[in-house]
C-alpha cells in the first residue's frame, strides 16, 4: 500500500460534502434519493414477506406485557441511552424521544439476535431528524443493520465482532496511509479504536453535525461500510497537525 495518505479524490469528496452541508437546504428539506431508495426497497421486501412496522411495534408491546426477558432488557438499555442521545437537541422540538423509543424497541423485536445495541440510538435519532416518519426510520435502521453493515456489527451481547474486525482494518489502513500519526498515537498509548469505533458504529452521527452526517450517509448508502473507512481516514488527516502537537493522552 502507498504511504501517501488519503487520495486527493478522498479529500476532495469530503471537502465537497462539507461545503454542501452548509447550504440552507441541507437539513430542512433533506430527502436523499439514495436513502429513500434503500428504505423503499426494504419496505417492499418486508411487506411482501412479513409484517409492517406497526405490527412489529404492537408485538413488542405485547412481548413486554408478557414479560419477555430479552425485550425487557433491551427496553431498559434503550431508556438509559435515550437521555444521552443528543442532549443539546432535546427540548427544542428537534428530537422525539417517544419516536426514537418506538423505532428502537420495534427493531429489537424484529431482530432478536441484535436486540438493542448501544450506538443504534444515535443512528435512529439522526434518521428521525432527517426528518423521516417512524416507519421510514424503522426500515432505514433495518437496512443499515441487515444489508449495509457486515454481520455481527451490532449485537445484543455487545461482542460486536464485525465492528472489531473493521477497527483492525482501519488501524492497519491508518498505519499505512498516515504512519507518522499512527505512530504518534501509539507512543501516547492511545488505541485508535478509542474514538474510531464510535465513529463507525454511530455512522458518524454522534460526532458530525446532522447536515454533514447525512451527506456522509449518501455515500454510505451506496458503498456500505467502505465509505466509513474513507471518511475516517480523511478526518484523521484533517486533524493530523493538532494530534501531532499533543504530548500526552489527556491532550
What are these model-derived regions, one by one?
Residues 1-251:
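Helix-rich, well-folded core regions that mediate interactions or catalysis
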